[in-house]
Amino acid sequence: MFTLKIFVYTTVIFFISLFVFGFLSNDPSRNPNRKDLE
């Protein structure tokens, strides 16, 4: 059960990081290769 909780927390943090990264690099002029990351 403890391992499952760690896995869930890691997944949540991972998706939040992706959301924040996508929001900060939403400007195509700063990050023209954004399509390659999706």
Curated annotation (Swiss-Prot):
Biological process annotations from GO: photosynthesis
Membrane topology (UniProt): Single-pass membrane protein
Membrane-crossing segments per the record: 4-24
Function description: One of the components of the core complex of photosystem II (PSII), required for its stability and/or assembly. PSII is a light-driven water:plastoquinone oxidoreductase that uses light energy to abstract electrons from H(2)O, generating O(2) and a proton gradient subsequently used for ATP formation. It consists of a core antenna complex that captures photons, and an electron transfer chain that converts photonic excitation into a charge separation.
One GO cellular component term: photosystem II reaction center
Top-level taxon: Eukaryota
The organism's taxonomic lineage, starting at the top: Eukaryota, Rhodophyta, Bangiophyceae, Bangiales, Bangiaceae
Organism: Porphyra purpurea
Quaternary data: PSII is composed of 1 copy each of membrane proteins PsbA, PsbB, PsbC, PsbD, PsbE, PsbF, PsbH, PsbI, PsbJ, PsbK, PsbL, PsbM, PsbT, PsbX, PsbY, PsbZ, Psb30/Ycf12, at least 3 peripheral proteins of the oxygen-evolving complex and a large number of cofactors. It forms dimeric complexes.
Protein name listed in UniProt: Photosystem II reaction center protein I
Main localization category: plastid
Similarity-based family: Belongs to the PsbI family.
Subcellular location: Plastid, Chloroplast thylakoid membrane
Keywords: Chloroplast, Membrane, Photosynthesis, Photosystem II, Plastid, Reaction center, Thylakoid, Transmembrane, Transmembrane helix
